[in-house]
Swiss-Prot record:
Location within or outside the cell: Cell membrane; Postsynaptic cell membrane; Cell projection, Dendrite
Protein name (database record): Gamma-aminobutyric acid type B receptor subunit 1
Residue span of region Disordered: 866-891, 908-960
Gene name as annotated: Gabbr1
Residues in coiled coil: 868-924
Gene Ontology BP annotations: adenylate cyclase-inhibiting G protein-coupled receptor signaling pathway; gamma-aminobutyric acid signaling pathway; negative regulation of cell population proliferation; negative regulation of dopamine secretion; negative regulation of epinephrine secretion; negative regulation of gamma-aminobutyric acid secretion; negative regulation of synaptic transmission; neuron-glial cell signaling
One Pfam family matching this protein: 7tm_3
GO molecular function: extracellular matrix protein binding; G protein-coupled GABA receptor activity; G protein-coupled neurotransmitter receptor activity involved in regulation of postsynaptic membrane potential; G protein-coupled neurotransmitter receptor activity involved in regulation of presynaptic membrane potential; protein heterodimerization activity
Extracellular domain ranges by topology: 20-590, 652-666, 731-767, 825-832
Amino acid sequence: MLLLLLVPLFLRPLGAGGAQTPNVTSEGCQIIHPPWEGGIRYRGLTRDQVKAINFLPVDYEIEYVCRGEREVVGPKVRKCLANGSWTDMDTPSRCVRICSKSYLTLENGKVFLTGGDLPALDGARVDFRCDPDFHLVGSSRSICSQGQWSTPKPHCQVNRTPHSERRAVYIGALFPMSGGWPGGQACQPAVEMALEDVNSRRDILPDYELKLIHHDSKCDPGQATKYLYELLYNDPIKIILMPGCSSVSTLVAEAARMWNLIVLSYGSSSPALSNRQRFPTFFRTHPSATLHNPTRVKLFEKWGWKKIATIQQTTEVFTSTLDDLEERVKEAGIEITFRQSFFSDPAVPVKNLKRQDARIIVGLFYETEARKVFCEVYKERLFGKKYVWFLIGWYADNWFKTYDPSINCTVEEMTEAVEGHITTEIVMLNPANTRSISNMTSQEFVEKLTKRLKRHPEETGGFQEAPLAYDAIWALALALNKTSGGGGRSGVRLEDFNYNNQTITDQIYRAMNSSSFEGVSGHVVFDASGSRMAWTLIEQLQGGSYKKIGYYDSTKDDLSWSKTDKWIGGSPPADQTLVIKTFRFLSQKLFISVSVLSSLGIVLAVVCLSFNIYNSHVRYIQNSQPNLNNLTAVGCSLALAAVFPLGLDGYHIGRSQFPFVCQARLWLLGLGFSLGYGSMFTKIWWVHTVFTKKEEKKEWRKTLEPWKLYATVGLLVGMDILTLAIWQIVDPLHRTIETFAKEEPKEDIDVSILPQLEHCSSKKMNTWLGIFYGYKGLLLLLGIFLAYETKSVSTEKINDHRAVGMAIYNVAVLCLITAPVTMILSSQQDAAFAFASLAIVFSSYITLVVLFVPKMRRLITRGEWQSEAQDTMKTGSSTNNNEEEKSRLLEKENRELEKIIAEKEERVSELRHQLQSRQQIRSRRHPPTPPDPSGGLPRGPSEPPDRLSCDGSRVHLLYK
């Protein structure tokens, strides 16, 4: 029987069972092929996992990577859209060889590009031409082939007038030859080398000669103050100042603006020196400590990380560095989800990182604090294939193996905790074997400088920073060359500079700010704060030792990758647990099983309906109101048919088809309930109305008018149609998604499953549920009451009302039990579907069996196939089948009673005979005649006793 009370419940749990999942998700994009000579990096997935799936979820990003010296031309990253396609599919991505783009520009000249569909591709050709008053030194043409230019890059040299007189320009320098950082030991010889190379060039400052005046600052601000005074107040005038240490540079740069002097440092790294308001004329070829941040951001983008966390030691240098990182990641669309700091004890911050599920962590602290941090990292298990740590690269190579009494972790534990972390370190020597503006490679520079040093390079202070000092002189020379006009163009006279001439200072500042050239330390360029933009070395700890995995040039946004990075999990981890949305679908075995039962039930309903129609002329069938029974069979068929759309979900149908399925469930169940239960309710209502009234009102009510029964059923069906139509028009059912808590898969992968379940719902679902629950619930309760009240009533007009009552009991019980259970289990698709569908199946089966099977059995076993006319002709009587049955029962009972009476009479006769015999014997023993009670009057002849006149003793003897 139908269970419309369960309609809203069936309209909800129609995504279903976890066991049936045809794809990772019902929505997503199909995996695509990489370009030739390239591959695809899948974030958070291993190679085996990629092979096992065909679709990737919406918003998932893939990145193209190329082999060898090739680079991606076209979109590097594609994102899965909601419509199932990847972004920018109309633009192909290719892996091509690209030559250096530095050949596309020529100072004091022009470059003409021909061939190749894009600059610097294989087959591209460049021709070089110099401006007037300059001549070309080198080849005038170069061709790009297999990522290399065919000839070295030429340069334009000024046409110098022979025997021209050159004027001296002085530089005031402070070299720390001793103290905390004795960098002047190697930087001073490097500066002297640069001055020799610059002064020997005919195309740079052809009318001037750079000369150096220097002092030993000892990396002491007090000592530096003394020498600064001497430089400023003693002739000759210095056009620029060159301090070394950060502490000395802070003093010099803050005071230099009062004398309109440009300050160029070669060894200062403090982020505080990037403050343009405080140090308006400061430049440095030594990168700021914040230069690590562009590299970090680039790596975040390379590996597709959008969420990072940070932990820092509370010192000024790390705070300012982290503030800069926060601004940069925000511009790149990356979020710092969690920021922690500590002064001396990192235990609590590390625990907080673990609690917040931090995966990509940037650590800023000194070496001693680094050991404390990673001891806590080991305790919290905040390492392994799910985590990546970014640290500063200037720690000692074995910093994690150094004995430290402040921690309680062993060397083995520390080694395990730090494995795989990434470090960034400033590159102070160009790793590429290319020639700089001085026509020297970095290796040639090292060899030439080593010959000038008095001690071994490892024992010489500032040897690593020496390339920066060398390039500082070249940056100054090129800026002064631009300011003076380069010998052939209009410019200022450098010899006119004095400490009150701000005009020349401003021009030198602008020229210095626009510097861009290839030095022995790499590409030299300054950012808006005057800090050097240099290459960054990227290393990874692999097997307990650091391995170079790449370089990054932030000025060109060029990442040189060696592809030697290794990951514990085989690939870079995700920045968070990868959440894959999956729909819970109904178990197909359950759906098929219930569908088979429902199909058999529909067949049974058709058989019952056919039987009822075929035998509608039989009196016994006629007296059961066959038309109402036919409606019941049709209602059961509709209810059983509703099982099929109840089991349809996203596994079988698309999103656009879901509203139609929702409406099908609603209408099939609604009409099925009205027809099936309404027909039975109408029968039991009429029986109760007619046969439970007072005796004086019965006679005129016993006339059954069928049209009233049909009108009652029509009223119930009409109410349902009206209500369902209003519901569908005003607030139609649509597809909604229920989201459950994340689930961790059994496999040890960094993925969480987000289960979702499809439901049919509407905006005012609770209102409609209240209407249906109230209306149908009252019908069920009233049906139970009427069935109970009429259980002892017997009527020939509706001879199956007791069977109808039994069917109503079953339907009501199943509804009242299944409705609340299904509401509780609405989020468990298999259980909810099983309860709801089986309730429909069982109630329909019971109704059909109770109403129709007894009729079939009676007609088959008793052969009562005659119609009413045939029965009248045969018997000559209008006695109905019910009266004939009663007559036969009474006759049988009468025969049994007659048999019993005959047996009793025979027994009575036998007892009488025995009684007479005893009386005769007694009379012989007592011959005297007793006194005559009649007073001597003669007695008439004795009469035999009446067989029916017995006293109490005889009756007792008779039945003893």
